[in-house]
Amino acid sequence: MNAKIQVHDKSAWECRQSRHGHLPKLPARGCLIAPSQQFKTTALTDMILRHYTDGRGKSCFERIFIFSPSVDIDSSWGPVKEFVRVNMGVPDSEKCFFHEFDHDALNKIVENQHKMTIAMKEKKGNRRLFNILIVIDDFSDDPAVLHNQGKNVLNTLFTRGRHQNISCWISAQKLTTLS
C-alpha cells in the first residue's frame, strides 16, 4: 500500500497576484510591528499602490477597506483613497474608510465576502475569485480591537479569512498589543 498523502478533488481557484514573485501570495495575512514613526502606514500604502498591482495601476484587490483612527487626518492615506475611488472605480456611496473600529461594519464586510465567494465558486466555468483587503492600522491603544481574547472577527480573519479570499494586514507598535 502506498502511504503517500494524496490530494483528492482539489479545485483550483485563482485570484490576482502581485507581479513581484517574492511577495506573499494572496490571500495573505500579515502584521507590521514597529515603534511609532517607523513608516508602517507608508509601507502599507506602498504595498497597496505599487506592490500589489499589475504595474499598470490595476489592483490585485477588488475592494480595499481601511480601518484606522488616522485615516481622515494622516495624509499617507490620501493616495489610497484616490486609488480606490478613481482607479478601482468604487463610488463614494460605498464606505471603505473607517476612522473608528466598527465591529458591525467589519462583520458585514466578511459576511458579504463569504456570500460572494460561495456564489463565484458555484458559477460554472469560473476559476477566478473576488479578492479583498482589510487593513487594521494604528489601533494599538485600543485593547477592544487588537487585544481581545476569544471570539473576535480579527481572530477569524487570520485563521479562516483566506477561505473567503480576504487578505488582512495589521499594523501595531508592539507585538504585545496583539493577541
What are these regions, as identified by a protein language model?
Residues 1-19, 71:
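N-terminal pre-Walker A segment at the start of P-loop NTPase domains
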